[in-house]
Amino acid sequence: MATIKIPPVLRASVGGEKEVSASGANVGEVLRDLATNHPATESQLFSADGQLNRYVNVYLNDEDVRVLEGLDTSVGEGDTLVILPAMAGG
């Protein structure tokens, strides 16, 4: 299982937890497992076509998955994913 660090903006969707565990062989599967176990996160993470929302950044062991293999990036036992929704301001 991988550990997912949950940002404050998503914590209400996972019962207030700062970290949750999820299973999967790659980033996409781990995030889908998160969405299965915490359905309120699905629309916050994924677009209608099943792709990761463009404003959501995901890091695997401090590496941006966009520069790795995206949602196909392999996840090993004990790995940590960090979800960081992009923030905009003015």
Where are these regions (language model features)?
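Ubiquitin-like/PB1-type beta-grasp interaction modules and other compact soluble beta-rich domains
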Residues: 1-89
